[in-house]
Amino acid sequence: MGSQTEAVMAEAFIAGAVRTAIGKRNGSLSGVNPVDLGAHALRGLVDRTGIDPAAVDDVIMGCVSQIGPQTFDIARNAWLSAGLPESVPGVTVDRQCGSSQQAVHFAAQAVMSGTQDLVVAAGVESMSIVTMGSTVTLAMQAGMPAPFGTGWRERYGDQEISQFRGAQLICEQWGFKRSQLEEFALESHQRAVRAIDEGRFDSQIVPLDGFGQDEGPRRDTSLEKMAGLAPLRPDWEITAAVASQISDGAGALLIASEAALRRHGLTPLARVHTLAVVGSDPVLMLTGPIEATRKALARAGMKVDDIDVFEVNEAFAPVLLAWSQDTGASLDRANPNGGAIALGHPLGATGSILMTKLVYELQRTGGRFGLQTMCEGGGQANATIIERV
């Protein structure tokens, strides 16, 4: 107390990053138990880095729909299912769609604090097996109340709270038209197809039973086909074509201290530079990445043009359009290999998948700084700046 000497935090490095290919709903991964899906990513990370798994201090795994096979601490169950040491604990995180980005934050913070040296940050979600929203609908069928109490209703009323309405409200407040959303969505598919054809994802994917290519991108989609889809509601701009796909997948990253890098002979891919998280309007729900990006850049003493690559989750096309307009970030540098509209959004896995994509894209291009941000249920967003090393 009273010391004028500031504590110097340790640095956290990403020493490994892998992901599964992303499966479509009822696609190639739909028959894989999510515990085994997560286990595959964890085992792939251990094999890729060559780390002694017993040296890992903790496993932090994001997962949104924690019911059925995704409950009972799937982080622990996936680690054990991978045949990895019982001595290593695991904890499961729910910050909605940003769950495994938050896992990266928690892992980095543990390393930066000096309390841990080697932490796995991961994410998993099987939306084919555990349907989106089932944690609420099944509970209500069993007689349990909705996850909004008296205080919530007194504050926000009984208006609809959903990601779909949030996306439409963004269109209305920012003035986006359906044609703009569809043009953005088409570009996402085209970028993803190009990335697949050029093999940009090959080194980051650990194939599962021969499945090693993202199956969401549509090669034959067009503005004409998108225009033929019905909107979610008659007077809305939002259609299925401009929303992220329901998907299955998993990802895992190894976060290490500088001492752990030396001790275990690890080669870092990136340094965790800056962490930020914000709350935002829970009714709009999806605008948090705007303020999270600003907060991360301000904390880092950087400007938007200092970032070489952005990974911004494409929950819906208007999320990216509003984010770009308000932050000044160019969409040319955002999601260069396609986003969730084309590749899919396996909820709790997406944060780890986006971070893996970001790390590898910086390695591929030689860029220095990357920023990842995601909108999250409840009106929240994480932002992470990493630096290639």
Regions found by a protein language model. Give the residues of each.
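Active-site-proximal alpha-helical scaffold in enzymes
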Residues: 95-125, 171-200, 252-259, 346-365, ...
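Short, well-ordered amphipathic alpha-helical segments that serve as non-catalytic structural scaffolds
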Residues: 34-50, 74-78, 103, 163-170, ...
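Condensing-enzyme catalytic core mediating Claisen C-C bond formation in acyl metabolism
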Residues: 2-34, 224-287, 291, 298, ...
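Active-site pocket-lining segment
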Residues: 168, 201, 211, 273-342
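N-terminal extracellular/periplasmic Venus flytrap/periplasmic-binding protein-like
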Residues: 18-20, 31-35, 39-40, 48, ...
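Conserved catalytic cysteine-centered active-site region
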Residues: 63-117, 157-162, 220-245, 326-353, ...
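Flexible glycine-/small-residue-enriched beta->alpha junction loops
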Residues: 118-173
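Conserved beta-ketoacyl condensing-enzyme motif
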Residues: 30-118, 124-142, 205-215, 283, ...
